[in-house]
Amino acid sequence: MQEPTSICVIGAGLSGLVCAYKLARAGFRVQVVEQQSTPGGMLACSRLGSEYIELLPHHIRKSDRSLIALLKDLGLSEELKWYDSLWYGKASRKKLGYLDNGFHSLIAVLVQEITDRGGIIQYGYTVSEIARSEDPTRPRYRVQCVLGDSSSIILECDTILYTGSCRNLVHITHALDMPTDFRDSLMDVTYQANICLLMLTKTPFTECYSRQIPGDEPFQRIIQHTSMVGPRRYGGHVLYLSGNYLTSAPLWTATDAEIFNVFFKRLQYMNPSMTKNTVKTWRLQRTRYAKPLNHPLDEFIQPAEGFYVCSLAMTPSSAEDSKYRMDACVSQANATVAKIKEDFSREKELESES
């Protein structure tokens, strides 16, 4: 009996995990490689009190059909609750969704579904090069990964599914014969980085869930998470301060403590009653490729034979705020998996005819 086609999914963010889950369910042999030590990407979570919470703010909208359908498919519909949220400067409240156990539940169930179906997820694997195999009896691609101890390993697979940043894709595919226009379009994509300070405070900063900060400030948005979902078991009130920057900005290279002091000084100016004694704990998350400022003219989904790209930076949806991108990630993952399955079926038909 012929072994199922092997697929290497590069990246264990939401896009990569959804693709891996659906491919494993369809019978493909799936291996996911992730540079970080934990899954989730921009949905990565941290323990806060007795609960998990996202290091970057996220919520669900009623219009997020693909994401809501995924939750139903995974048996998480009952965890989805809808809340009224007050937005600063808005006349009405917005109805937003959040999971009982946060989006950690979504990531955990996806990981479990992948591994239950024989999929493998490798953490601490940084892809350094992708090359074609020169041996026709071997799988089509060779993926070289650098491990945490600086050693390297080569993985073999029939198909590549890449979910990372556009520029990194160019750097790791020099050995592949890809169209010059495709490479140029990827290098033309520019990104803003993001710094997000997550604080647990004794008292709330505001009753509003979301507030945009105008002008040249160290952060551009305040999200009072617990004003929407309540204090739960976090042990206090959860506040996010989020800002986008170019990596040339001095704040990007500052230490975590320096960034905290800059952010808190501005927060205290807005509300003098806030003191550092009101802060119980805090986390700082830096995201290098957070917000693409532009995208290629064409949505290249398959730059080479057996090589697929599922990166939100390839689509106009990348311009949305990160907390709105989950639905676009799931929708694009669905389309990519459908394309892979269609191509695989076509290859099998051609093989049977020959």
Task: Give the positions of each predicted feature.
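Dinucleotide-binding Rossmann-like beta1-alpha1 core, especially the glycine-rich loop
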Residues: 49-90
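Glycine-rich FAD pyrophosphate-binding loop
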Residues: 24-47
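Short beta-strand to alpha-helix junction loop
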Residues: 58-65, 89-113, 252-259
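Conserved Rossmann-like nucleotide-cofactor binding loop
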Residues: 15, 38, 167
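N-terminal Rossmann-like FAD-binding beta1-loop-alpha1 element of flavoenzymes
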Residues: 3-32
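A conserved beta-strand/loop element that lines the FAD pocket in flavoprotein oxidoreductases
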Residues: 115-127
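Mid-domain catalytic core of redox enzymes
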Residues: 26, 125-252, 257, 265-270, ...
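Conserved flavin/dinucleotide-binding core of flavoenzymes
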Residues: 225, 231-354
